């Protein structure tokens, strides 16, 4: 799909400071693209979107500035909430095991060790060795919960749970996270704020933290 042929295209994440971006073993010359996983980084992206829109439509500059200001305030509240509830997860429980490697920015921001079964792309495949190594982590670090993702098959997560069970260690699915897709259109979880609220609340509750099942705004479906 050639988006540039249909109009102006701005890669809004390209202008993020390089010192906040994470490299990944899957890509020698590119950065981990999942910058939306923390509100603080996404606030920088919103500012870039605002500026790009103003350049494209200077006649609507005041509207873009006002909308961005309102959304940035909402993201600031989300950032505060997310940091607060995740800080209640016991240090020894801060191991986040997910279907694919999408949560490295999350881990860096909130002090979690992040382990994805698949690589950074949902199209990559996990080998038996990778699953075996992760079973070792679950057992040795007494990990109690792992997480499926809405956009990735749960097959490998189930294999992890079964592998741990075979070694006498019980692991449960802590919940479903949104990584490369948000919730259903029209739902709270189908918005950026709702997606991050859902992820942070789900992780905190599953790993022993203190968070209301209703989330930041009392709007999560639970």
For the regions a protein language model found, what residue spans apply to each?
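Extracytoplasmic metal-acquisition and chelation regions
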Residues: 1-222
């Amino acid at each position: 799909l050639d988006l540039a042929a249909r109009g102006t295209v701005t890669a809004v994440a390209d202008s993020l400071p390089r010192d906040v971006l994470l490299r990944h073993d899957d890509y020698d010359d590119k950065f981990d693209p999942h910058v939306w996983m923390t509100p603080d980084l996404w606030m920088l992206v919103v500012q870039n979107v605002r500026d790009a829109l103003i350049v494209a439509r200077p006649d609507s500059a005041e509207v873009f500035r006002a909308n961005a200001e309102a959304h940035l305030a909402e993201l600031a509240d989300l950032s505060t909430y997310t940091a607060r509830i995740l800080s209640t997860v016991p240090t020894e429980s801060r191991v986040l095991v997910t279907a694919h490697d999408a949560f490295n920015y999350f881990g860096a921001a909130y002090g979690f060790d992040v382990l994805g079964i698949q690589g950074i792309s949902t199209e990559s495949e996990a080998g038996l060795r990778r699953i075996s190594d992760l079973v070792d982590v679950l057992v040795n670090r007494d990990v109690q919960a792992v997480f499926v993702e809405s956009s990735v098959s749960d097959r490998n997560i189930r294999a992890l749970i079964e592998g741990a069970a075979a070694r006498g260690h019980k692991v449960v699915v802590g919940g479903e996270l949104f990584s490369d897709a948000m919730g259903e259109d029209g739902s709270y979880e189908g918005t950026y704020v709702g997606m991050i609220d859902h992820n942070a609340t789900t992780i905190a509750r599953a790993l022993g933290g203190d968070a209301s099942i209703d989330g930041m705004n009392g709007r999560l479906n639970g």
